[in-house]
């Protein structure tokens, strides 16, 4: 985009926007299908579509919070507005997905509502919505002079993401395909696992190093 003629930049912007939208909708849809155990009935499709819009709102929310941290002026004010809108959609999506999730798998419902860990696990959604409420309060006060508090929305968004990931992990462990395939069932031959381990040891540090480098390049406003 940076190297094309000015008259073509808008087309590139459109491609980036709709490409990103398609990617997030697809990721959310596939997550929803995975949660249902790869079902294809109407109920599962509806849940997957809800998941698609919820994941898109989540990405838009954390992206807007990142812009609040990295920008100033008119763009920052727009980012604050976007974050407020997306926060409401995200909160509604989390509530809907959480309740529907309990209807999909008996094991998940029993874990959250009937097991001895239920009270402890309920701390996750309570904390999650507490963080969203706190983030909403912070967004109402922004922007403040001197950039005070502009880092808080992104930090709170990260915590919300981590809690949602934790809830999913706890709910569906040890399944790779919920209700059908466990980690132990899917284990490959020991030699194959050793090969994957070597690749992981090489690739993961490279990804982390690249991520750190990118954050350093784009540090500051």
Language model regions located:
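Membrane-interface helix-loop-helix junctions at boundaries between adjacent transmembrane segments
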Residues: 1-55
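Loop-centered beta-sheet repeat module
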Residues: 39-86
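Short, membrane-exposed interhelical loops at transmembrane-helix boundaries
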Residues: 177-196
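Hydrophobic alpha-helical transmembrane segments
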Residues: 52, 123-128, 194-207
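Transmembrane helix-loop-helix
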Residues: 1, 94-159
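Membrane-interfacial helix termini and the short, flexible loops that connect transmembrane helices
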Residues: 1-12, 69-77, 131-149, 219-221
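Membrane-interface helix termini and inter-helical loops of multi-pass transporters
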Residues: 34-43, 103-114, 179-185
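Hydrophobic alpha-helical transmembrane segments in multi-pass integral membrane proteins
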Residues: 23-36, 92-103, 162-179
């Amino acid at each position: 985009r940076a190297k094309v003629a000015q008259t073509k930049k808008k087309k590139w912007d459109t491609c980036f926007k709709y490409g990103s939208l398609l990617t997030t909708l697809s990721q959310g849809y596939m997550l929803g299908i995975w949660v249902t155990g790869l079902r294809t009935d109407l109920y599962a499709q509806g849940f997957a579509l809800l998941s698609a819009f919820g994941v898109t709102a989540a990405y838009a929310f954390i992206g807007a919070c990142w812009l609040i941290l990295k920008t100033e002026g008119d763009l920052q004010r727009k980012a604050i507005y976007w974050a407020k809108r997306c926060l409401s959609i995200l909160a509604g999506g989390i509530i809907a997905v959480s309740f529907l999730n309990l209807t999909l798998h008996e094991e998940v419902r029993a874990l959250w509502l009937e097991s001895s860990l239920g009270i402890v696990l309920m701390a996750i959604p309570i904390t999650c919505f507490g963080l969203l409420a706190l983030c909403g309060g912070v967004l109402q006060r922004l922007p403040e002079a001197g950039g005070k508090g502009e880092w808080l929305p992104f930090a709170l968004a990260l915590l919300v993401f981590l809690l949602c990931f934790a809830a999913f992990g706890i709910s569906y462990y040890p399944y790779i395909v919920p209700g059908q395939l466990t980690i132990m069932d899917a284990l490959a031959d020991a030699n194959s696992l050793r090969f994957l381990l070597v690749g992981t040891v090489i690739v993961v540090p490279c990804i982390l190093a690249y991520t750190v480098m990118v954050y350093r390049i784009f540090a500051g406003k």
